[in-house]
């Protein structure tokens, strides 16, 4: 029996409502593979993004919590606990690697090759950068370096298209600037470049805020607020590095909200 595209989309929406995101991913993977040389609709594209974002987000949160506990146990000298925690962290890292490999293959094999508009190209290249960045968050040594290089290439390719094809107020262009700046700050340890990129994107969007359409006003202004929040946080940390240490356990950066 042939798998029906509309049925898969419906089941993905149902899975989203039930907060069963692993199943939502599976349904949207079917859709992406069904379309062959066609492009996903904006709705399908957003469903795919939301599905993977939730699946990866839960594991990223777990990894951060486990890593924080590991550091505390190390500081106490509880070597036996540390060994158990490291083993458990490896399980989460394997899950993270598998999820990232899944979406990156889908992007390279189906989604990026069929993208025909500037908007969809930026969307998928940004997504590619995001999932390589998630790998760079927990990988070490040569693997981390490779993930960071792939992230930079994807974000730069997306940025080149966004600067030409999308207005400064476009939520996808703003989301790209937000996540690219987080990459500079968190992975490349370059707060100056992170702040420059975030400030430039914010200032360019503010200058054209009057021309912003009603349909994207909410998304665009939300991401602009996130850019400003990061700028405030990063600037204060650069002026007083010790301030960042006082926020133990807090997420030190914010990323874009999905549609």
From Swiss-Prot:
Pfam families cross-referenced by the UniProt entry: 14-3-3
Biased composition (Basic and acidic residues): 244-259
InterPro entries reported in the protein's UniProt record: 14-3-3, 14-3-3_CS, 14-3-3_dom_sf, 14-3-3_domain
Start and end residues of each stretch annotated as Disordered: 238-259
Coiled-coil positions: none
Record-stated family: Belongs to the 14-3-3 family.
Protein name: 14-3-3-like protein
Species the sequence originates in: Chlamydomonas reinhardtii (Chlamydomonas smithii)
């Amino acid at each position: 029996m042939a798998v029906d595209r509309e049925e898969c989309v419906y089941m993905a929406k149902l899975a989203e409502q039930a907060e069963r995101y692993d199943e939502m991913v599976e349904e949207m993977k079917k859709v992406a593979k069904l379309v062959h040389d066609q492009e996903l609709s904006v709705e399908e594209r957003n469903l795919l993004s939301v599905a993977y974002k939730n699946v990866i987000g839960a594991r990223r949160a777990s990894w951060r919590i486990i890593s924080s506990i590991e550091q505390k146990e190390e500081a106490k000298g509880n070597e036996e606990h540390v060994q158990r925690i490291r083993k458990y962290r490896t399980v989460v890292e394997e899950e993270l690697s598998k999820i990232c490999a899944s979406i990156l293959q889908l992007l390279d094999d189906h989604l990026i090759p069929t993208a025909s508009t500037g908007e969809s190209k930026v969307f998928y290249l940004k997504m590619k950068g995001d999932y390589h960045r998630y790998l760079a968050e927990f990988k070490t040594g040569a693997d981390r370096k490779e993930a960071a290089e792939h992230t930079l290439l994807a974000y730069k390719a997306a940025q080149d298209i966004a600067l030409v094809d999308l207005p400064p107020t476009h939520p996808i262009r703003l989301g790209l600037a937000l996540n690219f700046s987080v990459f500079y700050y968190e992975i490349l340890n370059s707060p100056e470049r992170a702040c420059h990129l975030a400030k430039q994107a914010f200032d360019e969007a503010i200058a054209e805020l009057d021309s912003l359409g009603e349909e994207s006003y909410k998304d665009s202004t939300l991401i602009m607020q996130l850019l400003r929040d990061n700028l405030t946080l990063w600037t204060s940390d650069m002026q007083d590095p010790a301030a960042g240490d006082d926020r133990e356990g807090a997420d030190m950066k914010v990323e874009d909200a999905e549609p």
